[in-house]
Amino acid sequence: MPKVKALQCALALEIRSVTCPGVVLKDKEDIYLSICVFGQYKKTQCVPATFPLVFNARMVFEKVFPEAVDPGDVVAQLEYDTAVFELIQLVPPVGETLSTYDENTRDFMFPGPNQMSGHHDSNRQVTMRRISGLRGIAPKLEFSTTSVITECLISSRKCRTQDKFTYHSAPVEKSHGRLQCRTSRSQKKKSKSPERSKYCINTKNYEQPTISSKSHSPSPYTKRRMCELSEDTRRRLAHLNLGPYEFKKETDKPPFVIRHVDPPSPRTDNFFGSPGRDCERDGWVRMHSDHPHIGCCRSKDYKVIRSPHGRDFEDPFERCEEYLSPRTCSKPQHSARTLLVHSAPSTTPKHCASPVLNRASLRERFHSDWCSPPNCDEIHDRVKDVLKSHQAHARHLCDERDPEREDELELKRSLLYRDSAYDSDPEYSSFQRPRGSFHLDDGECWSNRAASCKGKSHRPVFENSMDKMYRNLYKKACSSVSHTQESF
């Protein structure tokens, strides 16, 4: 492949020390200096965090300008490049930059006379810019540079890939013997294969991770923040495989669920049929299980209520009407109107003592067995017979007959259709009836002797007393309503 002529610029940089009198760093981690020239990153060895920082490091930066025809073109192109120095301390998680210094590469490589400390001395001193974490005076960097522009021969393919790689093909002549030794070694590398030389050239670029990034594992928040850095920083931290990260809002989390229902037992499945088919056909209510640590705080599971139309009973008053509606004692609990599925109580130990979580739900407390349904129906029938009877309405609204006569008639009616039923019931047999005396509503004392003399049992007298109490309550309610209407 034919070779073409090109100009190569070589920079020999020798870093001596960084001084900052009177400044003590709060962190004791090691410090190193990072340098970027010609787009190539290099770094010094780590030194203890005590000023002055003595590095005594020597570095060589080389770059080929294939399109330049004279040194003036090279100098003109150097104006578009910047030399950057960063003083970095290995503070977790990714290191902390203490101070920086940046200058145009042309002025950095070819300083003016006023930037030199002496006529025969090549040492230079520049003041670095402090970052907010460093207090006191600004650090001062002491270094020396040697720059050479030479002509070299490179292939046309290397000309096209010059922006990615750096080549060591031309000698760098200087009075110092160190550069000549490096030139002789670089000439020996010409005989190596192209694949191996390409690998060696890639290692010259600053593609290796920094020391601080190797010694620490960044947190997820640090990873997301590091993705917002510049492209140069992305290239330096490419080994972390950060990828595209985005900040997520807290509202993206799934809602917090408390209710929990255990799967039905096999016995229940056999009684009600297949759970999968029943869910599709009858519309069972499905409830999502909550987090495992929430289920431990539940005293017992909830009940699932299903109607034949596939809707839930959400209104507690509708459930109250169903419980208070008349029904017989022989009616099964699993009726056609309502189906109650009681899941097994949770066997998980209780770790939470909160009364709010241990308390049963409103629906469960409402449907608890504080009294059996037959007793509720019986009480409801008696109250409804008293309040909705034609005799009670006529007596309190229209009739002005004697109250004592009405009491006797009501007592006879009650004896006709109630006394026989309760006397035949073994629950209210003679040996189970109360044998002590008690006071009635009108001040009369009733006992077993009075019952034997008058020929009345305790049950009719008790019912008669209850009827009087309900009539008085109804009369008071009607009078209060009439007074309210008159006031309006």
From Swiss-Prot:
Q: Which organism is it from?
A: Mus musculus (Mouse)
Sites of the Glycyl lysine isopeptide (Lys-Gly) (interchain with G-Cter in SUMO2) crosslink: K248
Gene that specifies this protein: Spata6
Instruction: List every stretch annotated Disordered.
Output: 176-225
Assembly and partners are described as: Interacts with MYL6.
Annotated protein name in UniProt: Spermatogenesis-associated protein 6
**Protein's GO biological process:** cell differentiation; motile cilium assembly; spermatogenesis
Please describe what happens when the gene is knocked out: Male are sterile due to disruption of sperm connecting piece formation, leading to acephalic spermatozoa in the epididymis and ejaculates.
User: Phosphoserine modification sites?
Assistant: S217, S219, S265, S274, S325, S343, S346, S354, S424, S465, S487
